[in-house]
Amino acid sequence: IISWDAFSFSNAMSSLIYLRDPGDKTLQERVYRELMAYCKEGIYGIGRVFTAEEAEKEEHLKGDFSFVVESDGYTSFADKAVRPLVVEFDDRDYRFGHATHGYLPDRGAQPVFAAQGPDIREGIVLERGKVVDEAPTYASLLGVTLLDTEGEPMEEFLKA
């Protein structure tokens, strides 16, 4: 590759889109329009396009990327830069299988959070939790407070 405007960094069921010049509003608008057209067309496996701002606000995901592309639930994204850009399912690379990561929290595997110990209340069940609350919970169990972090300790589990 000798010249580029944008590239995709795969996270399997989602992909981060980086721009060569994130400050170039014309480029940003062009790439956004193209991504939205791919999403609307329905054949490229894109279920949703997030701007960086939407990804941070809705999913606590932030970084130097400009967009996040979420799978339609059936498509894995790769890092190939050569044609063909759309290929049949191939499980030779574990990152692009059907049982992988990179989904939005309400899709794909739903991991279990389980805790036991002298500072954990017994019999507590939460139907849903937030990953951003796990580190503050662990810190609280250790008697420390995390500074400059998102999320809150899951007090429901903790003994007073």
Positions of PLM-derived features:
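Secreted, luminal/periplasmic, and some membrane-associated catalytic domains
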Residues: 1-89, 93-95
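Substrate-binding rim/cap in mid-to-C-terminal beta-strand-loop elements of soluble/periplasmic
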Residues: 2-25, 96-141
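A generic structural signal for short, solvent-exposed coil/turn residues
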Residues: 9, 61, 105, 146-148
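Composition- and surface-driven signal marking solvent-exposed, interaction-prone regions
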Residues: 31, 82-83, 127-128, 150-152
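Non-transmembrane alpha-helical segments in soluble domains
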Residues: 32, 36, 135-139, 155
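Short, solvent-exposed coil/turn linker segments
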Residues: 45, 50-51, 119, 130, ...
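Terminal low-complexity/disordered tails
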Residues: 138, 142-147, 160
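Cytosolic regulatory/linker segments at or just downstream of nucleotide-handling modules
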Residues: 152-158
